[in-house]
């Protein structure tokens, strides 16, 4: 035998060893290939979508830890480009996300080509919803919307869905009762961040989004979390104060031990469909303790533990302690998550025996290993830890050990010392194990990529095929290249025999994309995204303990709209309230004309800090450390995160005048300045154009109690009161006047036999008749004479009624009987036909002189009186002195009466209340005593006409009763049926003349009669005697408007009474109707001249009177002395409107009477003259006969303007006119738009130093140690993550001014810092020195109207300015609200007598003008066209000026430039109103959400919308719920019907503009079931089902099911119950519900009725 060391034996040994090595290599390569294939099958969704590059699509912002989705993010790609179609029903989804906005958005959805949902994950507040198909979903109680990073995994394995958190330690499982057999549609679409185009967008950051085809990946998903996602994880605890981030020390070991969680809150699951029963279970898995001697730790175990670092050896125990329980419970209540703690220690050569941590094992104690940990040499050496702190929390970042575990003895490697990135512990070198038996070949794997050419092996004999072995567990992922340890170099193998060339292998399939590469460098910051859509409001949570005031919360979840409540009862009138605070600024009105630029205002306070920018990634909050020695300057680090804003500095010195800047943004309105001292009178400016009517000022203090007000409007009729007891008989009333003759009654029964009549006179003897023929045989003879009167017999029985006898002849008219008892009041008869007007009665005798009556209301316009005689020539007055300048006048008189406002629309009808159960009948009460006579009730509603009763039997003739007293007035009976029109009655007897009635209402204007002949001059009457002075009467309450009385005769004029005392001002009575014209009485004698009366209030402008007769020409007055020259008056308004009549000129001398001229041709009728002064009352003329109505004459042309007359003397003050009627308040003006912001005020002066703050609480940290020596210069550190903005420290005391440093170089422009917190408002600084005159800036946008300033002292009256140019005619403004009447002003001094004017000659009548052009048709402007119509009105006024052909050349031309500018201004307002609707019927919005986005301070209520923005005739009145995110709610026509009064087109637009809808339908039932049966409590066969708007059927167990809020109708206990159905869907086309089927049939004792709630769209 050859020895073993021979070459052949060595060759055999080498061959055996080489085959073993080759087998191991093949096995290792196979494992690696399997691992690579498994990893290659994983899908990195972000990489597939192209979101991890330097330039992501629009709407995505790249960050170091992933990508941020904004509202502009749009990802909708085919599924095949993201997920392999071969993905089965078992896979895992690993997510690392952070939500920035609370809403109900989907993270992703996979939709089939038929737009059906296949797979989707939705984050709602407090829950995660996973959709598997269109109708199946499951939700987990897990809150993602808390602003922190969340690492989680979802395992989907057939019918089972499991949510893993805490690195797999916590899982919640849900099972579905059906198998989702739908496969992935290759033609479907993948959407990221939303479900559909109209749904809400997910706003937040995504660091990792991977899909693994294996369900095992979710069990320990932390192994697959990327590095940058771990660093961004905010579940890890923050660093303690005064400890910065630890550097990545290669000598540091990071240990993490699991903690047994003893109590975990049960996770609740719920399904949205009733047919899915889910078995949920809460389980907690704890990874096993470490058993390998190489200290292989789990990657990231999110359990919780507490360890202590002591000076002695300490053992980390996995058992829970009391401290652990308390802290775990606290953290669970706070965040509902499990946090991680770890211990970080470093090796040090100083002490290697002091600290040692033993890691015990759980299964193999003999393999436990020990490693040593030394004291920390980091910052803890410079500053000791607090005594109470036994550990500190550091960033929980873990990496897997790079030492692979031994593979159950099948393979052995010589191990080098283990290399760690953070775990640098060298394991023991293992002994080589025995070679194990070859395993069976595994299942064929996927064809891999073509590998490098391997060495040629020996040709072995083909072995028998083995049975396929079981699938091995997935191995741990390999270590990244460069970090893996190099294996022990093996012995060189022998050179193998050259193998035969193998057949070329088949071409491998294209592999899946490889794993994602290392994260790239920080990309360029993309543009800021558009603001995101408003999220759905969250559901209301359970009330927690009262915490500190938090930040402004997000909008709440869409609530169920409540039932509209009934209006409450009217409350009692409260006491007058305290004057309220100044109200908020009203909406600005229409813009006024542009005024001149005012002087610059004082420096304003600093404005508010702007809104904060987008929230950055939260960093770790570090506190300020102790000040150390100044070290050498380090390298320039990267640009840091902008710091917090500093304290505002002191106001600097005034700089030099700079160049004019760009026009600034409108600033906020400055505070009201301090009242300045009165300045000198300025130069009189040009009068500006007339301004708009200003906003109503603040309400003044309550004035004294006014006079008694007018009676209020008649209120609505109250409910019928309880019938009161019968009242006592009233006093017999005065017999009323005789009524009209009634209809002829039916023939009455035969009356009793009348008394025998008086014996008549004997008749005349008749004429002898002819002898008669022989008569027939006579009848038996008549009964003989009665015998003697016998005794009275007994009363016999009542005999039967005899037959009705024949009607006898009409008897003579009997005497008038006694008045019978008053009969019952008959039914209200129908009003009779109006009677004809009676003749005027004869003139009555003149009555006695009456006392002076109260001041009557203003009568109608009288007819033109006859021309009176010439008055005497007045004496020449003395020249008056020029009076002193009067004080400024008080508030002017009230304006003209406003237009009558339109009647408001009826309010919405409230929902019908639920009918209460009928109560049991009460016990009969004791008969009460008759109560006092009640006040007459309100007229009750008319009852229905009763059916005609059967005729009763005729009673016996009653005895005539005694005349009864007059009964009380009965309640009005029901309206009887229409009776036949009776015959016209006889004319009544002329009654006596009644008293004079009040003035009747003004009648319509009658036809113009022919001009009567001039009457003869009446005789001058005698002067009456003066009456006595009457007492002033009290102010009477306004009585009801009386009916016009009969026309009384005109009484003789009474004697003139003496002047009475001035009575109190009576209230304005209602305008009476115009009565008929009375007879003209004789003219009274001229009375004596009364005293000068007090000036009365300004009366309303009377109607133009009839043109009076031309007066006689008076004598020529003497020429008065010229008065002082008056000041030149201001130019008046445009003369298009008739001006007030000028004073009458002096009467000229009477000329000689000329010869009678020839009658001239009839002149053209002139224009209607200006209302002349009322002439003296002429003598009454004889009334002429009414002539036929003449044809209207043609309108004459306007005559030439006559010469200007001389100023006549000022007439005496007229008598005090009666106050005009109070006008009806006009319609409320349209609320104007919110004005633009004003220009920013100047910076205010620096505030004074604040007071020294209170000393803070003593911190738990120890004293600060002595500063250490300066350390060596460190290398430039990597830029850290941006930290969360720290809390503002207390304001320090003002330091002493330091020495001025050397001037530094000009630095680079710094980045935009975060906006600082708004500082306390400083005291108002002293006004600064006036600056130099700057260049005129660009005209800014008009700011809102400021608050009214305090009234300053009256300044010195300035000189009168020059006459201004005529202003343009402004646009017609809205009718203002009629203001209260002002107090009458004091009586002014008598004015100076004017200069005598020269009387001008009377001009001839002008020629007749041509007929005018036809007028334009009327145009009904809507609200949107008001401004445009006003602009057109401005231009039409210019054309009117040209058409009327004024000859006055003094009128200035209109400024076309300013007119065009004003038109453009109106057009801009019009466009603004279209873009920003008000929600009124004239200016509707498309949806309520538009109003919410345009106006942020609207209240919930009724608004108008027009979804199709078409004609205003189909506008919809809706209820807007802005507190629910801008819901648009459509109410049904009635609360018990499903009909909604919206057209089909408008409803289609509402569906297009909405993304979700909700509606509630309630069925009120009594002993009847509509859903569940009483036995099974499950939907019965007789349940109702619904028809949606698009025709789909909604029923239990169907494709779409209704949700139940309450189902109590199965209870049949004789009481009313209800079942509430809620329909909430993200397909708005389903609502509203249009029909309900299978409603139950009611039986005796069972009822139901519907209550249909509004349908709300969002």
From Swiss-Prot:
Protein's cellular compartments: Secreted, Extracellular space, Extracellular matrix
Chain residue ranges for the region called Disordered: 308-332, 345-364, 427-550, 571-614, 637-1332, 1377-1415
Xref: InterPro entries: Collagen (IPR008160), Collagen_superfamily (IPR050149), ConA-like_dom_sf (IPR013320), Fib_collagen_C (IPR000885), TSPN-like_N (IPR048287)
Compositionally biased spans, kind Low complexity: 491-506, 657-666, 678-692, 837-852, 875-890, 1112-1124, 1215-1230
Sites where the protein binds Ca(2+): 1506, 1508, 1511, 1514
Major site of localization recorded for this protein: secreted
Pfam family, one: Collagen
Domain Laminin G-like as annotated: residue spans: 66-229
Biased composition, class Polar residues, residue ranges: 308-323
Biased composition (Gly residues): 733-742, 1307-1316
Cross-referenced SMART domains: COLFI, TSPN
GO molecular function: extracellular matrix structural constituent conferring tensile strength; metal ion binding
Residue ranges the record assigns to the propeptide: 1421-1658
Keywords, comma-separated and alphabetical: Calcium, Collagen, Developmental protein, Disulfide bond, Extracellular matrix, Glycoprotein, Metal-binding, Repeat, Secreted, Signal
Positions of the UniProt region annotated as Triple-helical region: 424-1417
Positions with biased composition (Basic and acidic residues): 1040-1058, 1125-1137
Protein role: May play a role during the calcification of cartilage and the transition of cartilage to bone. Together with col27a1a, plays a role in development of the notochord and axial skeleton.
Domain notes: The C-terminal propeptide, also known as COLFI domain, have crucial roles in tissue growth and repair by controlling both the intracellular assembly of procollagen molecules and the extracellular assembly of collagen fibrils. It binds a calcium ion which is essential for its function.
Family per similarity comment: Belongs to the fibrillar collagen family.
Protein name per its UniProtKB record: Collagen alpha-1(XXVII) chain B
Organism listed in the record: Danio rerio (Zebrafish)
UniProt lineage: Eukaryota, Metazoa, Chordata, Craniata, Vertebrata
Primary gene name: col27a1b
